[in-house]
């Protein structure tokens, strides 16, 4: 429901008074975060560079578009297989929001992470150039850049945020 959606940290971070918001998820993974934003009415472009993950996401979106409760949300999600950095650098049309959730380096903690995340971590190496990704996002001149990080990790590209939300495990 919309009430629960409003409590999601990502939704709170993305909140805007604008309508027809266009967003880019530059590090789509399995697309859950972009799905949350699309559920809020955002038009989302998802970039996934790993071909295996992209195929899994493409299949999930294809199936979701046939589901009566999901089709309106997934209609606002467009998947592009490839690296988002080049696209962000050459972007000419306006974009309202860019979401970055690069794969974090493996944790030293032995706590079990869920199976889906384990699979993604096996398929996708940690982001090789976070600075390039962040600089490309800045170059695209969005109204807002949202970065998801583990609580204890350094800020992306060493840049302090202008605004920060903290949860139990992420900020």
Question: Which residues are covered by each model-predicted region?
Answer:
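A short, acidic, amphipathic alpha-helical segment used as a generic capping/interface helix at domain edges
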Residues: 83-87, 125-138
